[in-house]
Amino acid sequence: MPNPLYRQHIISISDLSREQLEYLLQTALKLKAHPRGDLLEGKLIGSCFFEPSTRTRLSFETAVQRLGGKVIGFSDGANTSAKKGETLADTARIISGYTDAIVQRHPKDGAARVAAEFSRVPVINAGDGTNQHPSQTLLDLVTIYETQGRLDKLKIAMAGDLKYGRTVHSLCQALKRWGCEFAFVSPPSLAMPDYITEELEEADCRYRALGSLEEAAEWADILYMTRVQRERFDEQEFAKIQGKFNLEASMLARAKPNLRVLHPLPRTDEIHPDVDAAPHAYYFEQATNGVYARMAILSLVLNEEV
């Protein structure tokens, strides 16, 4: 099969077909099993992070270097010409003249698509506001497949901040292609947005609301925890919702043996440290898979054959 992602922007999961996602998934698994250090030889990647990041930025940069490429960029938009008023369109024009691809994180929804419109090289969205995070979704798919042996017809529970959490939005849009069933556990003020539940209905995917993490752990194959993102609230609002849904090891007592607890990280208090030793905990392995998922994205975008 010809590489369907060569020279393509990776902006939103909704832009990708099931076949493209499977191609990415299988490439990530192949690179994990048999690493290659030559796929980005002679390539220069622009790492443009206008918003703080640890795992995403470092795993992308690790992926580039493991593939034989080099990285230039910044980790704080305050230290760029954006602070002087330069538009995102102009920034994309300039950096695309220096590099072979751009990896961008930005606090504004839709920023990745703006950059892609004006860039001369592929743009990979590393998170744009509350909107999309496609590379996180790919590493989630790799992890789910790795732990469950399939993606079809799984029961996926999502808990915490489902309104602003771009990771759960992207993951729903991906897993609906495999006919998964969903359960949501969140305060009403942080419920899954209507546009996501409408997409699930259109795909004939069932979903429900559950009242507790114990229920979710007993029902699900995957329990996907999320952090309430303090940076998206004022202090008064944050105090009202903080700690509403925190997972402890005792809540996993009736979980199925195959249940795995995932989290995009960083966590605060929504997963108690006593969960780390549970056989269901898999979020640190999930983070490691970020390197292989991002190796797959970069390799396929910049090579006709991998």
UniProtKB/Swiss-Prot annotation:
Pathway the protein acts in: Pyrimidine metabolism; UMP biosynthesis via de novo pathway; (S)-dihydroorotate from bicarbonate: step 2/3
InterPro entries (alphabetical): Asp/Orn_carbamoyltranf_P-bd, Asp/Orn_carbamoylTrfase, Asp/Orn_carbamoylTrfase_sf, Asp_carbamoyltransf, Asp_carbamoyltransf_Asp/Orn-bd
Enzyme Commission no: 2.1.3.2
Tree of life domain: Bacteria
Reactions catalysed, as given in the entry: carbamoyl phosphate + L-aspartate = N-carbamoyl-L-aspartate + phosphate + H(+)
Binding site for carbamoyl phosphate: 55-56, 105, 133, 136, 265-266
Enzyme's top EC category: transferase
Pfam family, one: OTCace_N
Keyword Hydrolase: no
Binding site for L-aspartate: 84, 166, 227
GO molecular function: amino acid binding; aspartate carbamoyltransferase activity
Keywords: Pyrimidine biosynthesis, Transferase
Keyword match Transferase: yes
Gene Ontology annotations of biological process type: 'de novo' pyrimidine nucleobase biosynthetic process; 'de novo' UMP biosynthetic process; amino acid metabolic process
GO terms under cellular component: cytosol
Quaternary context: Heterododecamer (2C3:3R2) of six catalytic PyrB chains organized as two trimers (C3), and six regulatory PyrI chains organized as three dimers (R2).
Listed HAMAP family: Asp_carb_tr
Function of the protein: Catalyzes the condensation of carbamoyl phosphate and aspartate to form carbamoyl aspartate and inorganic phosphate, the committed step in the de novo pyrimidine nucleotide biosynthesis pathway.
Family indicated by similarity: Belongs to the aspartate/ornithine carbamoyltransferase superfamily. ATCase family.
Record protein name field: Aspartate carbamoyltransferase catalytic subunit
Gene giving rise to this polypeptide: pyrB
